Amino acid sequence: GIKLRMPPGEFWQFLGESLGANPTPVAYAELYTALQTGTVDGQDNPVVASKLMKFDEVTTQFILTRHVIAYDVMAIRSKIWDAMKPEQQAKFQAAAEKAMDENTARFEKQEAETLEYFKKEGKKVYEPDQNAFRTFAQKRYVEKYGNDWPKGALERINAVK
């Protein structure tokens, strides 16, 4: 497999292996140079981060495996939540959901604009079969960690769209 820069740490390294790569721990601050010199062949980062950090200057292609799912979490102390009246809780919940939806929409727009920029710059953008990646990687995860997962966890993971 390719030498794929993954963050240091057991779980990140295992993720790289599960994707069929040779994971190479490289500090984020050293990634540009690692790509430039061939220490690594590729990287594992959102495309927007790749543009902001100018990794596209030393990268010719982007493969959108979408193997990490980002999500928003809105949290509030239970003491504060419990002190609210039901109508206040409902308003807070609605505002939180609206904020998360707007954040997701902005992220998706920024990602689409970044991918369009990469294509205009002559970069190749590939979108492989997500199910093939999931099946390949999931087998390794189930073998290594499956016995430690709560009952039904895999089904809930696979239900995410």
Region locations from a protein language model:
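N-terminal secretory/targeting leader peptides
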Residues: 1-161
